Amino acid sequence: MESCARSASQMSSSSCCRCSSFNQKLKQGGIGGGSLPVSFSCVMIGGGGGRRLIDQERGKVRGRERKIGELMQVRASAQGGLLNLGNLLFNFKGGDPAESTKQQYASTVTLINQLEPQISSLTDSQLTDRTSLLRQRALSGESLDSILPEAFAVVREASKRVLGLRPFDVQLIGGMVLHKGEIAEMRTGEGKTLVAILPAYLNALTGKGVHVVTVNDYLARRDCEWVGQVARFLGLKVGLVQQNMTSEVRRENYLCDITYVTNSELGFDFLRDNLATSVDELVLRGFNFCVIDEVDSILIDEARTPLIISGPAEKPSERYYKAAKIAAAFERDIHYTVDEKQKTVLIMEQGYQDAEEILDVEDLYDPREQWALYILNAIKAKELFLKDVNYIIRGKEILIVDEFTGRVMQGRRWSDGLHQAVEAKEGVPIQNETITLASISYQNFFLQFPKLCGMTGTAATESAEFESIYKLKVTIVPTNKPMIRKDESDVVFRATSGKWRAVVVEISRMHKTGLPVLVGTTSVEQSESLSEQLQQASIPHEVLNAKPENVEREAEIVAQSGRLGAVTIATNMAGRGTDIILGGNAEFMARLKIREMLMPRVVRPGDGGFVSMKKPPPMKTWKVKETLFPCKLSQKNAKLVDEAVQLAVKTWGQRSLSELEAEERLSYSCEKGPAQDEVIAKLRHAFLEVAKEYKTFTDEEKNKVVLAGGLHVIGTERHESRRIDNQLRGRSGRQGDPGSSRFFLSLEDNIFRVFGGDRIQGLMRAFRVEDLPIESKMLTRALDEAQRKVENYFFDIRKQLFEYDEVLNSQRDRVYVERRRALESDNLESLLIEYAELTMDDILEANIGSDAPKENWDLEKLIAKLQQYCYLLNDLTPELLSNNCSTYEDLQDYLRRCGREAYLQKKDMVENQAPGLMKEAERFLILSNIDRLWKEHLQAIKFVQQAVGLRGYAQRDPLIEYKLEGYNLFLEMMAQIRRNVIYSAYQFKPVVVKNQEQQQKGKPDSSNVENKRIGDANLNPVSVTESPSSDSPQNT
């Protein structure tokens, strides 16, 4: 291998020569043959008076590739030696963690395996009956640990009969890790979805319910339909909660033994339950055991964004449009600056002057105008929130795209006027601004579960965070087969243009060899741009991103991503929860074939799924591309499917089912166990025959793909965590299959541009050729350091959010407990008496003071305030109090008694007029005051959190300041709730409402009108005097 040092001018000309050579190869569509990814090997070194390049591109292309191949072999050998040395050192320190886990659970696995012959001999009904026996043992007090071996053996046998899958020993270990309340790290393809049913079944035996949480509706439905079959076969009820379900359906599904649900739906249902105004509106049961699939995605990636339920707040939309026009006219670094790392903008002096002149105001921060917030949000919308990256436009709606999953977050909106600013930028109708009604972070929400566990393919790198925040230990579960995927070195370019050209070359080469290729992009925009380049290169491919037309075909696209020569471009949607089977997924293809023929004939017109509340859904055909199926269905099986569908239509009715009902029945039909229902049995038989026919073709295709080298994964940008990069790589090499991966990077990528610092900037200045691949140890260290910076930065954000939310969490718990007490209690008398006595104490303390001697008591002032709160205390006089009370304690006891008796007197008055009405009024008063004041408290504490940051300049800890001020605000809020509720109760007067029918006839009601129930759902007919916070003085 030859190296040569060149001067700056020589290097420039040489680089240009190399650049043209490289471009020529790009135009040719590939570099050489073979199935392995091309080895880019231009190395940058430093020394002497400048920088030198060691050029390995000498001689003919074939000779260059041979040299590079030798270099890669030497490097692999060196890396293997270092790896072996590392393993020796690691084993010396304590051994392989996966092997340690295997040894820890070996005895229990042996016990389960010993039970297998006995359990296998049972009939289907006998196997189902085992659930009742195990449940009796659990309810009688026997520990779940002692029941575990038999329960796992039962689930294994049921899985074998229903799914045709026998859980491996390592899957049993994964189930035991989950049952223990830990995080199980399992590689992709090791069957995490099937593992979840083991501890879910065991813990469901207690009758307290189990939640299996996934990251999106698609995975929740898929898992419920697939592994849920096992639990249903064993006699358990399995529920599914989806985004567009009604409260009644949600409640029914949450009451099942095992419920599949997304993290956001579960969190929002919790918040909605704590805004309910009647017990009938509650949907959740008590929390017991929770299994989180892709636990790192939910507890780490999404932990930065709290769950928020908002209500409308009136704001003039014209200001958003004006602000958007101003932001569009402003120039960066002249009128404002942008901090992409902190996601903040700052208006400069020139920006202030121009904005104030355009708006004809003296001060942007004038509290009467508050233009500054509108301008800042408009600039954020312009610079930091980009179309087809952070959001997409569907119709006249702005829909947020989740940065971690790549999916549309239906129904979500940015808060604090930001969503309105984006709407103004894009020129779509602006919806009213919102105000927070309830919020909680994922950290504090999931910590409410008495028993929490999770599973993922990548958790070890975040084990410290899991243990420090969630008290969850990470356990590495061994693989069933060795992982043989080849992870190639990163290829780095100076500019993004060179990177994308190289990606196209890589895809072209792989496609020619027959390798299936999965390309991961970080945004909708990137996926669409790459798709256009592949179309120009005449490379057939599929695109999976947040666009609605692609989302609907998600399962279809994933099912064929592992087929020979398939090219799939995907955002992070394909990074998690998707199992790409080499050769194609025969069973899923069979299900799609039956679905294609069944759904149009049984689903009601117009019930084609949830699209938008603002426009009718498009007509849905369920038609699947013919190229998806590996072969044309034989006449025998086509007839079998047609007969089964005809029987289903005849039995269920022509177009009589909702889509959800039809999907559920289809999922039952596509199982493997025996069926009692004639229609389900007929459909199931057709499904199994079609799957069998398809499998002969997919198995043959799988062999070809394996020989070619397996699935090749291409990453186009480093993510904010190595963990997310590994998720993408993990789509390849499942269950011992071959595969490869390579990342193509650019120094202009967001992560390096924003977090790279001076070292990356220096590298960008040193390398001026866009198409020249760069490789060096210094560069690798710089890129790794930038990624570590991002990881540490976002960890600090999550930790800070958790610390601040912990302050609010204790307050939230107290408020929600008080609210639930008012909602569910049949008798609120004791609570109202407590409120009355404490309010008397507050008034007494504010107007007399515990240290004041009797001769200084201002009894007239005290009595005036008391009578403002309660007209029933009009008999109080200074003489009466003076004669009956000699000390402050006597006065306190006397006023408490007066407050208590006044409440009881008021209650009797109302009950005499309308029995049962006082209880409803009390509940209404408590709930409405809690909700209103809690909403105001959330706003106030948000302002405190924003303000305390500045106190760091005064050498004061912002978190401690936040805790102190937050605590004082909370105490005042709780006192205000008590005062408002008891004041309203004292002033409450029922209103006689005549029967509506009699009012129309003009006849009096002959029955006792006052005994009629007044508006259960809404107490609007009841006249409730305003609380002290409005018409009456609230200063006690």
Curated annotation (Swiss-Prot):
One of its GO terms (biological process) is protein targeting. It catalyses: ATP + H2O + chloroplast-proteinSide 1 = ADP + phosphate + chloroplast-proteinSide 2. Residues 995-1036 are annotated as: Disordered. Gene3D superfamilies: Helical scaffold and wing domains of SecA (1.10.3060.10), P-loop containing nucleotide triphosphate hydrolases (3.40.50.300), SecA, preprotein cross-linking domain (3.90.1440.10). Its EC number is 7.4.2.4. Belongs to the SecA family. One of its GO terms (molecular function) is chloroplast protein-transporting ATPase activity. The keyword DNA damage does not apply. SMART domains: SecA_DEAD (SM00957), SecA_PP_bind (SM00958). It is a peripheral membrane protein. NCBIfam families: secA. GO terms for cellular component: chloroplast stroma; chloroplast thylakoid membrane. Residues 1-76 form a transit peptide. The keyword Ribonucleoprotein does not apply. Has a central role in coupling the hydrolysis of ATP to the transfer of proteins across the thylakoid membrane. It holds the Pfam family P-loop_SecA. It is found in: Plastid, Chloroplast stroma; Plastid, Chloroplast thylakoid membrane. Keywords: ATP-binding, Chloroplast, Membrane, Nucleotide-binding, Plastid, Protein transport, Thylakoid, Transit peptide, Translocase, Translocation, Transport. This is Protein translocase subunit SecA, chloroplastic. It comes from the Eukaryota. Residues 1020-1036 have a biased composition (Polar residues). It comes from Spinacia oleracea (Spinach).
